[in-house]
């Protein structure tokens, strides 16, 4: 019984994150998820079972430890002679001068309280990694949690579109949201689109599992019909959602996911499909780099800038101002407002760079850039291993597609800033590491090379 409970922790917690962690506006919901994350991590720490970590898990642990060290250094008090020499601190010194105060010891982060809040938001993804890798779980259960939450989100989205397009609607969970379109359990329609996209490879993985359970043609056809129905539901969700992110990434994600079911034998076919996915991803990034379309963002969501290029230019200016030292974790919105042109200021404000890589570079400086490159190298090597080795199953491959879609989307948005997508990303990474085929012997890991005569 205890083993079943332990294996249910990851899918149940993932489901909770997907339902409750759709926005930072949900203060109490996020606090509950963070406290639960601490409990999961503590459980894993006292679990007496001896489980050897796979090499990829050990590597990811090292990267995570480096990230934790970098975050901790943000809050270490520095003497005035040191922190005043860092780029971008002249504005802080001016503030001390206006108040007639002598500068004292201060941390590297310009907004340490925001940094602590951002660090606490990392607890759900860490707990998800620990739950899958240390406590263990069944891969299909995780996939079912993703697909189930997505189906519920689409149905909720249909009610949102059919109802009042304002905060007065009972179907929108957050006061500030993209009203008039399907946001599901999220405040941002782009983050709902991320969930819809990530659900596609997990639907395909479940379909591949169901089709291999039996040789009965009718049962296989029924399984494929269920898969087709689930994919149709996701397509409806994308239409109701109206996000450019969903439209731009749908084709490459769908093509890559199709390989989990069809599994073409020819290397040329597989390479062509992967090339199509790559081209689609590039087109997606190029599309979202164009000026914002008011039809998609809506007048209520308009920011004080008119295009992503202008936002990127302002973010680059922030990088130039704070240089290799960084401004501190969670400080982007405050830093941007310090440097924003008065002519562009109105009743709305920029809260994120809509490019998580650039935002982290501004906040964490050169060490953050190096850490991101190290993680991306790890992800690429792990994805390559999953694609080349027959030891990994369709859920590990679905994890590659899902995490890849999130990484691409993060170049033009900030989906990982929510507990929901953060936990989903962590679950995908964990599947890339531990989800393997069940085999009876080494011979099952490679194609049979001899003729069997019955």
Where are the language model's segments positioned?
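Short, intrinsically disordered terminal tails adjacent to the first/last structured region
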Residues: 1, 316, 437-454
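Alpha-helical transmembrane segments of multi-pass inner-membrane proteins
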Residues: 2-20, 30, 34-43, 68, ...
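N-terminal hydrophobic segments of proteins, predominantly signal-anchor/transmembrane helices
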Residues: 8-23, 43-124
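Helix-to-loop transition at the C-terminal end of transmembrane segments
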Residues: 24-28, 75-86, 158-169, 287-297, ...
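TM-adjacent membrane-interface loops and short helices in multi-pass inner/ER membrane proteins
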Residues: 74, 188, 309-350, 364-371
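Peri-membrane helix termini and adjoining interfacial loops of integral membrane proteins
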Residues: 85-103, 165-177, 291, 337-345
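Short aromatic-rich membrane-water interface segments that cap or initiate transmembrane helices
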Residues: 89-119, 177-193, 304-307, 352-360
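Flexible juxtamembrane loops connecting transmembrane helices in multi-pass membrane enzymes
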Residues: 181-182, 250, 254, 282-320
